[in-house]
Amino acid sequence: MKRKFTLAATVFAAVMNLSNAALAGANDYLFEPVKAELQKGSGVVVTVRLVYKPTGKPVSDAVIFSPRIDMSPEGMATMAAPLTPVTGGEPGTYSFKTDLVMAGGWLLSLSAKVQGEAETVTGKITFKATN
């Protein structure tokens, strides 16, 4: 009897674990700035961290696409700057080199495909460029 109960409990735990993974979605991920305030200028490196919210752990090896940085927080969405991906850094961090030509608020928008996740993860992160 005890053996059947133990087996049933093990199966139940495995099913619950699988169902939680199956219920994971794009909303379970969060892009956050590594440093929210940056010095304005050319060749500034902007770094974000992709986090799996249920565990708080960084997500490595995501495929990042459609990055864009502009001054929409300042009402100047057409004031965009080029972004160049930068390799290296801590696991779960994604960096871009850009030119923050003006002080003020900048918005980084980007999307990611996470391995095993059907939905696309999107993020909008605000940075402040200072003099």
Which stretches of residues belong to each language-model region?
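Positively charged n-region of N-terminal signal peptides that target proteins for export
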Residues: M1-F5
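Bacterial N-terminal signal peptides
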Residues: A9-N17
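Contiguous segments within soluble domain cores/interaction surfaces
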Residues: A24-N131
